[in-house]
Amino acid sequence: MPTNDIKLGQSVTGKIVMVFFGMTASGKSTLAKAWADFCRAAYYNTDRVRKELAGLQAVEKRPDGVGQGIYTAALTEKTYEAMLDHAGQDFSRDVKMVVLDGSYSRRADRDRVRSMTAGMGGRCVFIFCTCSEKEVRRRLELRARDPEAVSDGRWEIYLHQMQTFERPDTGLEDDCIRLNTEQPVAAMLQWLAAQPCLQG
């Protein structure tokens, strides 16, 4: 495991929001939480925030269909608003880095993060997490057997996202880094820590 976590977290210049996003089972939550721990950063996960807003326990299973139950557009909107509120509150307390973890499948939702962060004098870095379909299947099978899993992502959700996910346009979203998560977490943390966008 990398050993420069405290140095990196303390050396960040200004406010920064790190958004780990991608489709279900892309590895974003594993990496986002590891990065937040690595940097001693504040961390917020959309699955947890959504269930808090719905009055549910984080590990309570809700196999609702797309756009149904706790996954309606209205609650999704509230979830992303709450994520931004948390980040804003942290910045007001002089927190340097906030990590947001969620699908952020629409560019409009990513742009809202950019707008809020810029309004507070900060900057964003988006990490677009990807992996092969074979790995998605493997991870979803493991998740289905894990009683502590927070995400309700399933194969049908993945198939829906394949059709609807607004992938980042490198020409218009130049603050995005694409990362294949089929590698050791420690190696990914070292790679991220070396990125020029995090050096100042």
Descriptions of predicted regions:
Residues R48-K51, Y104-R106, T130-R137, Q183-V185:
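Conserved nucleotide-binding/hydrolysis micro-motifs of P-loop NTPases
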Residues K28:
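Conserved lysine of the Walker
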Residues T24:
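The conserved Walker
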Residues M1-V17:
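Extreme N-terminal, non-catalytic leader segments
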Residues R145-W191:
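Small-molecule kinase domains that catalyze NTP-dependent phosphoryl transfer to phosphate-bearing small molecules
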